[in-house]
Design a protein with these regions (language model features):
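S-adenosyl-L-methionine-dependent methyltransferase catalytic core, i.e., the SAM/SAH-binding region
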Residues: 1-170
Length: 170
């Protein structure tokens, strides 16, 4: 769910579905280090740094999240850092920040509702846009449209079987 919050300035914000449960389980504490490995609009990140005087490192590969990260950096200077990359690169990204140990990790895997809601991203069937489906449109050249229209039948079946987890793909 994406909403506008107005606390003196507008803060477009995505509310994670299980925010309370995740924060309760994570139990953020002062002077600890946390990672939100799928930053998105920063819902988990904001809740973590609001609960404790801690340091939070956020990871995302989608350049469109920078507008949310800028707001977080303004709200929580010296406590929030966005690292552009994939969550699979967490070790390298943290090493670049000279972080060798963390106290907690949030990982909300999957396509975000923001990507589905933005028709031009090509993740949704609800709009008449090109089939794109790239997480980072600046970094990756091949689109879902290219794959669907140019890959042979066997390759498409293999993609559907392996990544779509459809065992009957043939």
């Amino acid at each position: 769910m994406t909403k506008e919050i107005n606390n003196g300035n507008q803060f477009e914000y995505h509310f994670p579905v299980m925010l309370k449960e995740v924060i309760d389980a994570l139990d953020p504490r002062d002077n600890e280090v946390y990672v939100d490995a799928t930053f998105g609009a920063g819902g988990y990140s904001k809740a973590i740094v609001e609960k404790a005087n801690c340091k939070l490192f956020a990871i995302d590969r989608d350049p469109s999240v920078k507008k949310f990260a800028d707001k977080m950096e303004n709200l929580f200077p010296d406590r929030f850092t966005l690292m552009m990359g994939r969550f699979s690169e967490i070790k390298e990204l943290l090493m670049e920040q000279k972080i060798s140990q963390i106290d907690g990790l949030v990982l909300d895997i999957g396509v975000s509702s923001m990507q589905i809601d933005e028709g031009q991203r090509g993740f949704s069937f609800d709009s008449e846009e090109l089939l794109d489906m790239r997480m980072n449109q600046n970094e990756q050249n091949i689109t879902a449209k290219d794959i669907v229209n140019n890959y042979d039948f066997e390759s498409l079946c293999q993609i559907i079987k392996n990544f779509g987890e459809e065992p009957k793909a043939k």
